[in-house]
Amino acid sequence: MEDNQEILDTMIMAYRIAEDKNVLLPINVCFDGFYLSHMSERVEIPTQEQVDEFLPKYVPEHIILDPQRPMAVDPLTNGNLLTEYRLKHMMGQQNALKLLEELDKVYGEKFGRSYGGAVEEYRCDDADYVIVTMGSMTGVAKDRVDKARADGKKVGLLKMRMVRPFPCDRVAKVLSGKRAFGVVDRNVSFGWNTGIIYEEICASMNRAASFVPNVPFIAGLGGEDITATHIDYAIDKIIAQDAKTGKHDTVWLNREVMGL
């Protein structure tokens, strides 16, 4: 989530997704601690009547706590049932992805705010280069994309809004055909020595049989700031990667910008 308004709106959508009869799964709305969780920010709050109209009353059908309808919820599952459960979990997640794309448009029509569904595309249509972000860093990144555009650099931004299930088809559609892209992760995947979202995106591109020169970035660990200077540095690295083939070594933004 980029800001507190998006958190509020997504939370409302999340209930409708989780309670849909074709999903029925727990859902997490994740956002940056302190940068958003402890920040005072003005938001527009829908009325209770508007929310009630958007969120139908939840009427459980599969599990009901009712002494007149006793049931046992399986405490131990054998292989056959577990396989069926996992299949249905996977199907429910894929349904959630489709539902988010649809609900985002419905929410936008009703409340005047929408966020692109599973991903948000910012100035990507004619971009040669794309920087991929997630969370609160996106605000400053959008500003720097605008600055790069003003300087004649055709840069766009792709913001990840959903991680599970991963919107691999949309990601590949946006990034395929670009001259280069970079992913700024606020995490580390030690097995790959890159960030987690970077590897998810590379897997999506591989599934689409599409290769685009790319750069993995890691920044902002432990709450360290990701500033305009860091994003400008990342954009320049992505553009420099254009003429090369293969992957770039992971760039630790906070260290490189400081000259460490």
Sequence positions of predicted segments:
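A general structural motif
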Residues: 99-116, 133-141, 160-168
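Peripheral docking tails and interdomain loops at the edges
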Residues: 185-260
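Short acidic, glycine/serine/threonine-rich loops at helix termini
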Residues: 9-13, 38-45, 144, 170, ...
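Conformationally flexible catalytic loops at phosphate/diphosphate-handling active centers
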Residues: 26-120
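Redox- and metal-dependent alpha/beta enzyme cores, enriched for Fe-S-associated oxidoreductases
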Residues: 125-153, 166-173
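Flexible, glycine/charged-enriched surface loops at secondary-structure junctions
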Residues: 21-30, 113-122, 155-156, 211-216, ...
